[in-house]
Amino acid sequence: MEELSLNGTKTGAVGHGINGSTNLLWVQSNMVERKDIINGITIAVISPLFASEKEILDAQNKRVATIFDVSTPEELERIRPEDEQAPNIVVNLLDWQVIPAENIIAAFQNSQKTVLAISDNTSEAQIFLEALEHGLDGIVLKVEDVEPILELKEYFDRRTEENNVLNLTKATVTNIQVAGMGDRVCVDLCSLMRPGEGLLIGSFARGLFLVHSECLESNYIASRPFRVNAGPVHAYIAVPGGRTCYLSELKSGKEVIVVDQQGRQRIVIVGRVKIESRPLILVEAKIDSDNQTISILLQNAETVALVCPLQGNNLLKTAFPVTSLKVGDEVLLRVQGGARHTGIEIQEFIVEK
């Protein structure tokens, strides 16, 4: 038998349950002294595991998982929830990956068993964790170095971030002014947005306005619920990890966060970015607890709107079009630290105006 433990592992691996299940960390003996492998870990209890043929056993020689190699449809058909006594199933998909993973998720959706997939890189692991929307229960990451483990940890951190509700602040509009022409950015996403959802945009990183999507119906133009008319190229946009980037830096494949009126967020992928010269309007606002002015420039068009605060249980009013925005109207802001270095918040003195 091959012992999978801190003292005798021949390949590094990490098993991570995406829905809060037990985390298993298997590392090479020459990785143990690497400080970065335990970065962020306060206390760890590690249970040695043993691989014997197609089974994984614990220290008491009890089977805790069964390993299945899958390279044909027939081998996939043999994996059935009712046939296995072990609580965990580990699949090694040697041929196709996406469709077999989806079939396994469908077959085990009402089962109490945990299904993990073996992967040798983070990109492959992401495929398994996102298959059929729900993903498999976890990953056994079989690697020779610690970097893919840290990459997978970063992926889980980003997904966990989606469960955190952002604190949005009410701000009162103090000035509205036609500004002239500029290069504005339309951000087209790979996901649809609902009324009340949009992207966090602003001229200053310290205050980002919640800019509504073009999901609302109009008599003159079809709704585009995948699009946010986001503002000029210089503006900041919120991206995962508490970071910002410039609108001009966005491109296909980048991730941004979609936020609703209540601060709930989700990570979405940018499908396309359009930059065109359009007339702009300047909107300035202040929050009651701060005398600083926070501003945003947006295209001067009826389809561009700022999300407003919830009014009690009234879910009908979601946004003010910039063309009908008035001084005194209330909009939603995300207030945060203003000093940034490559999009990362830092502590330093800065003046933005």
What are the residue ranges of the model-derived segments?
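Short, compositionally biased
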Residues: 264-285, 344-353
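N-terminal intrinsically disordered, low-complexity, charge/repeat-rich segments that act as generic
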Residues: 49-53, 58-216, 223-225, 242
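Glycine- and charge-enriched low-complexity intrinsically disordered segments
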Residues: 281-339
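Short, well-ordered loop/turn sites that connect or cap secondary structure elements
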Residues: 231, 247-251, 324-326
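Generic structural signal for buried aliphatic residues
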Residues: 185, 250, 256-257, 328-333
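Short, surface-exposed secondary-structure boundary micro-motifs
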Residues: 242, 255, 261-262, 336-337
